[in-house]
Amino acid sequence: MARMIGGRWTVAVAAAAAFLLRLSGLTRPVRADEAGFVLVARAWDPSPDSVYGAFFVDKPPPLLALFKLGDALAGPLAVRVVGAVACAVLVVVAAAVARLIADERAARWTAVGAAALVTTPLIDLVAVKGEVLALPFLVAAVGLALVAVRDRAAWPALAAGLLAGIPLGLKQSLVSAVVFIAVLFVASYLAGRLGRAELARLAGAAVAGFAIPVLATVGWALAAGVRLGELWYALYGFRADAAGALGEGSVGATVRRGLVLALILVVTGIAIVLVAYLARVRDHWRRDAPLTAAVVGLIACEVVAMSLGGSFWQDYAFELVPGTLVALALLAVRLRERLVLLMVVSAALSLVGWGFWNVSGRQEFHEYDTGVALAQAAEPGDTLVVFGGRADLQIESGLDSPYPYLWSLPMRALDPDLTQFRELVEGPEAPTWIVEWWPFDTWSAQGDLLEAEISERYVEHGTGCDGRTIWLRKGVDRPVPEPDCSP
């Protein structure tokens, strides 16, 4: 393995492997978040009091625009090709940054480590969201900031700021590259590597670059007639309401996901790399204090952003990848190589397990199967609401939803007493179908009242996978959905 990684084609092979392995996601149905983004994008109709119109989602407009474009060109799974390209580019960019801060050998090993992290099913090999798409921009911003300081050049600083700003259009919490640039510039000034005028020139260029994607989003909102307060709420204000909703619920599931995420960080090697770097931070500081300060700031920002996410889903681990790769390149040769081997073995074993599980037909797609069954039973003009929000089921059914929340968290935060849901059920726009994917009383004390109101106007009409109750509005004649819930 060590001799193979020493070859001059290592970076290219690692990038190709990352691309091809990520393309395996094309064989799997669209996931809940991806489906939700596509549905929001399809119905996108901005207004003064709504960024997206019919549906609410707390994600930036550039991300939804990307999903809208991909869906228009090649359907909901098109974004997975974009994700595969992003992962391949990450490998190349990570190698370039490692070459910049270390040497050619570090570049090759870091490239392999990057490929392992973006292709391990322990994090997520299939779905593509903002975290994955942002990775090459974040790492490239780090490299360009280093070039700007080394050459005292404004153009790399401008490019670094631009690339650091783009991830905020993919997920609004991805500010780690901004922190890295700020700390690096200030620390370089304090260390005497930059004069005051040079600091001002580089900082000004970086801020100008950062402003381009931010102002572009603001400009779009103004042109579309969306109030800036609504844009701010969708991106940041909603998080306070979401945190309150999460705090009111049971912490058991969150704690379990947090423990699983912590285990994933260890098994994939991410946590070990970060701990190994921080354990030797004094040595790194003596060799290059400005770089060390910037890397520590990068890692700290990533950890905080991941923690503030609140739900601790396993793909949160992607947020730590940029800091992990930079830290990996700076580790001592022997330690770096051992850790990369650990990453490769971990990714390889999980790929084998994931492949066997899928090829043998053991992988469940219950949301997909239920959605397909509903599509077969429904007639044109039917509508559907999935209680608890399963956008992957919704999109496979082919049915529109008259309820604005396609995810459970917006429902819990913005309709906590289920007032909107109950008004919908009792009103003229009541959906033809309701799938009780979660029991009605899961998150709200009004769940029993909602179930009683639904029972007055709907009848139980079969079950989805895992025994989920399907309700059909009274007076409507449709065949009973019969999902093939294999395995």
What are these regions (language model features)?
Residues 12, 207-211, 332-354:
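Signature aromatic-anchored transmembrane alpha helix within multi-pass, membrane-resident enzymes
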Residues 139-159, 189-193, 268-285, 332:
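Membrane-interface transmembrane helices that cradle and orient dolichyl/undecaprenyl
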Residues 176, 303-337:
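Hydrophobic/aromatic-rich transmembrane helices and adjacent perimembrane loops
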Residues 201-244:
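Membrane-lumen/periplasm interface segments of specific transmembrane helices
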Residues 81-102, 109, 116, 140:
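Transmembrane-helix motifs of polytopic, lipid-linked glycan transferases
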Residues 19, 156-172, 177-183, 212, ...:
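Membrane-interface alpha helices of multi-pass inner-membrane proteins
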Residues 360-445, 465-466:
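Short periplasmic/luminal acceptor-recognition loop of GT-C membrane glycosyltransferases, typified by
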Residues 5, 99-100, 105-106, 153, ...:
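Membrane-interface helix-loop-helix junctions at transmembrane boundaries of multi-pass membrane enzymes
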